[in-house]
């Protein structure tokens, strides 16, 4: 007989907490008894995928996590890297996918609030926010509603809390029609002498609850985020938290002030699983126990019971361990900032989380049973790739309509390029970032959309570093081509890391470290687990190749919705890579727009006449948008070529030879050239070489090849070409010249013109694509 057969709960009640029958048996074994309702809820949230990574932890263990600049790796609230000169950067990415599908404004807003708390809990002042967003078909009214809500939520919270939203990415694909992805990344500059850790210590030390009050909002949010979305869960608004950015601003200042007193032993924000997670993780990491009295917790609603206290995910709350005798000093700081602060418990030697309510024990669980000793599933990989992938890999370029110098099928190359520029994934995101205050704090060096990565000035406000003059900056980006990952997760994940490093290199930054957000479907299905495992393998390999260790991140699984026939439809596997890099000299930062008439254009990476699997139309934006086909093999990543191309690009920027740099990504080389022309309001005359042996669409729209488009001051051409010949002798090509805007964009293949468009045509198509679709409401 299993324990569940004699449980004081029905099978439906247990399943309602996200607990499987075999997991309930394990709970009884760990406790030596049946849990009560509050304890069942605590196990439900702490054993959810969102909190314990029970399906992904074995895969995450292969990631590289150590490096010369890594100060804090996985396991804390955020990673921390050493930037030199006493500057330390905290950074992390988190998801808020399910809440944003249900209530897009609050779901996205509280996602921003949560990631900011991860940063300042370490003792860092938040200096920048990025986001990686995925939505469905923008022609659909529901997608437009979600898009409006998510962007409004991000802008509301970030603008009000006073942290600039400086960059990120937005993509659209029908694969996300039912399940948008909202990943938020934040950066912070350390203000404290010591990094604040989460592990509790000091028997008898008081435990402080600080911040906002506790209510019933966000009940069971962690479990909600660890299950597929259904018609019922899409109406589950109580599982979505409600944030207050003005209160969070006060919390930032109060926490940083408190940390500087030296009276804080440990700190943990209350994010997923609220009080349950913060008490269990602090106790387990410190090898101690915690006693907490719920009657002392400040509340905003009456009649709450232990289950509700412990599972509430009310926002803007923190748990501190204070040095004994200094608790009042900390309480006074928080009261001065208009925040709640009470002693709600203490640290005990017995490694147990013990919860009191109305004078009795409401819950008593070994801390490690909630945090460390959780279920882990070692799932079996299929013997061969799934049928859908094998079938997609059979596609070849010969299956496309015939192409000539005029066009493909009945469409001209002009028309096809404009079609790609009109794709919301490629088009201008001005509608998005104009809603963000991207210059608050006055440290934003590059405006959103002007370069391949965000760049922020490092200007400490406190401590010895604030007295030094520094011209350093930090660059950050988020990247993933989910279509690649759907077709071939291993190569797609490698491509995400490579593109992130390439984007940083295009602004002159040295890639340093990675935070990842793994957005996938159900790992319990063979296809879902294969996608997850292959992507993790690719990420691990690529991070080692680029010497960019993983400092932490987030796993968001069960991103699936039921279609009209009741069949689950997973998203594309989307392993988002957040990467940070060091800009050694802010006077030498590069944008993507052409700068001066007469500048020479160079293609770094595989030249236009290359023909191997490092370039491909498989999985390309051209194939998906122009031919409504998702098939083929994405381009293979050549790590050695990537490293050499990126290094010479950074060198050219640091030397002042390169005036603009832009990587060739979605849409291929033609789109990259058009985007640089648009950004600089200048034209270009480009020749891609003879058509012999190549289709024109291969020359124009093939993706991959470690490619970067750069423009160079003519005065530096000789020294630049000498450096190229020394560093990447077979991987560069002079392809043209920057021209007056009136000359437009002219792309030829040998003597054969392919594209001739005015800069105004490019700007109008690219610049208004999203607004034209939103105007349909």
Curated annotation (Swiss-Prot):
Provide the E.C. number(s) assigned to this enzyme. 6.3.5.3
Q: Which UniProt keywords apply?
A: ATP-binding, Cytoplasm, Ligase, Magnesium, Metal-binding, Nucleotide-binding, Purine biosynthesis
Q: What is this protein called?
A: Phosphoribosylformylglycinamidine synthase subunit PurL
- Tell me the residue numbers annotated for binding Mg(2+) 2: 118, 269
Functional pathway: Purine metabolism; IMP biosynthesis via de novo pathway; 5-amino-1-(5-phospho-D-ribosyl)imidazole from N(2)-formyl-N(1)-(5-phospho-D-ribosyl)glycinamide: step 1/2
Q: One biological process GO term for this chain?
A: 'de novo' IMP biosynthetic process
Q: Which cysteines are joined by disulfide bonds?
A: none
Q: What does this protein do?
A: Part of the phosphoribosylformylglycinamidine synthase complex involved in the purines biosynthetic pathway. Catalyzes the ATP-dependent conversion of formylglycinamide ribonucleotide (FGAR) and glutamine to yield formylglycinamidine ribonucleotide (FGAM) and glutamate. The FGAM synthase complex is composed of three subunits. PurQ produces an ammonia molecule by converting glutamine to glutamate. PurL transfers the ammonia molecule to FGAR to form FGAM in an ATP-dependent manner.
Q: Which InterPro entries match?
A: PRibForGlyAmidine_synth_PurL, PurL_linker, PurM-like_C_dom, PurM-like_C_sf, PurM-like_N, PurM-like_N_sf
Q: Name the NCBIfam families for this protein.
A: FGAM_synth_II, PRK01213.1
State any GO CC term: cytoplasm
Residue positions binding ATP: 53, 92, 516, 553
Positions bound to substrate: 95-98, 117, 241, 313-315, 556
Q: Which reactions fall under this protein's catalytic activity?
A: N(2)-formyl-N(1)-(5-phospho-beta-D-ribosyl)glycinamide + L-glutamine + ATP + H2O = 2-formamido-N(1)-(5-O-phospho-beta-D-ribosyl)acetamidine + L-glutamate + ADP + phosphate + H(+)
Residues that bind Mg(2+) 1: 94, 554
Q: Subcellular localization, per the record? A: Cytoplasm
Q: Does DNA-binding show up as a keyword for this record?
A: no
Q: Which residues form a coiled coil?
A: none
Q: Which family does it belong to?
A: Belongs to the FGAMS family.
Q: How does it assemble?
A: Monomer. Part of the FGAM synthase complex composed of 1 PurL, 1 PurQ and 2 PurS subunits.
Using the UniProt record, give the first listed, main subcellular location. Answer: cytoplasm
Per the record, the domain of life is: Bacteria
Question: MF terms per GO, please?
Answer: ATP binding; magnesium ion binding; phosphoribosylformylglycinamidine synthase activity
According to its UniProt record, which residues of this chain constitute the active site? Answer: 50, 96
PANTHER family of this UniProt entry?
PHOSPHORIBOSYLFORMYLGLYCINAMIDINE SYNTHASE SUBUNIT PURL
Q: What's the top EC group for this one? A: ligase
């Amino acid at each position: 007989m299993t324990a569940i057969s004699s449980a004081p709960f029905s099978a439906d009640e247990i399943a309602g907490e996200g607990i499987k029958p075999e997991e309930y048996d394990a709970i009884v074994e760990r406790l030596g008894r049946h849990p009560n309702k509050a304890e069942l809820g605590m196990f439900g949230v702490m054993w959810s995928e969102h909190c314990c990574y029970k399906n992904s932890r074995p895969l995450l263990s292969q990631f590289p996590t150590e490096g010369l600049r890594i100060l804090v790796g996985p396991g804390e609230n955020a990673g921390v890297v050493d930037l030199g000169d006493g500057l330390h950067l905290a950074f992390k990415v988190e998801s808020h996918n399910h809440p944003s599908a249900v209530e897009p404004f609050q779901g996205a807003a509280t996602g921003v609030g949560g990631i900011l708390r991860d940063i300042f809990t370490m003792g860092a002042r938040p200096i920048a926010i990025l986001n990686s967003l995925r939505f469905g078909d923008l022609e659909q009214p529901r997608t437009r509603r979600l898009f409006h809500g998510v962007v409004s939520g991000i802008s509301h919270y970030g603008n009000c809390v006073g942290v600039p939203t400086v960059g990120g990415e937005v993509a659209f694909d029908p694969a996300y029609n039912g399940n948008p992805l909202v990943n938020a990344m934040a950066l912070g500059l350390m203000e404290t002498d010591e990094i604040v850790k989460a592990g509790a210590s000091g028997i008898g030390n008081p435990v402080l609850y600080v911040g906002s009050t506790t209510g019933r909002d966000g009940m069971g949010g962690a479990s909600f985020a660890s299950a597929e979305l259904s018609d019922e869960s899409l109406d589950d608004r109580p599982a979505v938290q409600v944030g207050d950015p003005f209160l969070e601003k006060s919390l930032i200042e109060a926490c940083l002030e408190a940390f500087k007193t030296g009276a804080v032993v440990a700190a943990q924000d209350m994010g997923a699983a609220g009080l349950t997670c913060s008490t269990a993780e602090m106790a387990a990491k410190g090898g101690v126990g915690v006693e907490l009295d719920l009657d002392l917790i400040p509340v905003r609603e009456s009649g709450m019971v232990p289950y509700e206290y412990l599972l509430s995910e009310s926002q803007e709350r923190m748990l501190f361990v204070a040095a004994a005798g200094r608790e009042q000093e900390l309480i006074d700081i928080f009261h001065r900032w208009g925040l709640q602060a009470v002693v709600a418990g203490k640290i005990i030697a017995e490694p147990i989380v013990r919860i009191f309510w109305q004078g009795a024990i409401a819950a008593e669980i070994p801390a490690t049973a909630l945090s460390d000793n959780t279920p882990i599933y070692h799932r079996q990989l299929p013997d061969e790739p799934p049928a859908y992938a094998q079938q997609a890999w059979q596609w070849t370029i010969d299956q496309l309509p015939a192409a000539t110098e005029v066009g493909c099928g009945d469409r001209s190359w002009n028309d096809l390029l404009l079609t790609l520029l009109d794709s919301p994934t490629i088009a201008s995101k001005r509608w998005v970032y104009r809603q963000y205050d991207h210059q608050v704090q006055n440290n934003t060096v590059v405006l959103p959309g002007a370069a391949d990565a965000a760049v922020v000035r490092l200007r400490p406000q406190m401590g010895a570093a604030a007295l030094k003059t520094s011209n350093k900056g930090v660059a950050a980006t988020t990247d993933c081509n989910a279509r690649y990952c759907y077709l071939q997760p291993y190569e797609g994940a490698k491509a995400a890391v490579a593109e992130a490093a390439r984007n940083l290199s295009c602004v002159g930054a040295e890639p340093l470290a990675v935070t990842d957000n793994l957005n996938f479907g159900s790992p319990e299905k063979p296809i879902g687990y294969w996608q997850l495992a292959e992507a993790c393998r690719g990420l691990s390999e690529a991070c080692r190749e680029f010497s960019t260790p993983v400092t932490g991140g987030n796993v968001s699984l069960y991103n699936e919705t039921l279609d009209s026939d009741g069949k689950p439809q997973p998203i594309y596997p989307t392993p988002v890579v957040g990467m940070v890099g060091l800009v050694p000299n802010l006077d030498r930062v590069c944008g993507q727009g052409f700068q001066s008439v007469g500048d020479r254009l160079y293609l770094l990476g595989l030249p236009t006449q290359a023909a191997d699997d490092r370039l491909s139309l498989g999985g390309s934006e051209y194939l998906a948008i122009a031919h409504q086909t998702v098939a083929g093999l994405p381009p293979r990543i050549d790590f050695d070529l990537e490293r050499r191309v990126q290094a010479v690009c950074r060198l050219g920027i640091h030397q002042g030879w390169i005036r603009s740099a832009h990587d060739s990504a979605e849409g291929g080389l033609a789109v990259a050239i058009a985007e640089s022309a648009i950004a600089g309001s200048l034209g270009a005359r480009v020749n891609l070489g003879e058509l012999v042996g190549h289709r024109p669409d291969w020359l124009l729209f093939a993706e991959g090849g470690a490619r970067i488009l750069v423009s160079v001051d003519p005065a530096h051409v000789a020294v630049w070409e000498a450096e190229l010949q020394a560093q990447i002798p077979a991987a560069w090509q002079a392809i043209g010249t920057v021209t007056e805007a009136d000359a437009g964009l002219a792309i030829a293949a040998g003597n054969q013109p392919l594209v001739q468009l005015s800069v105004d045509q490019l700007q109008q198509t690219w610049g208004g694509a999203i607004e034209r679709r939103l105007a349909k409401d």
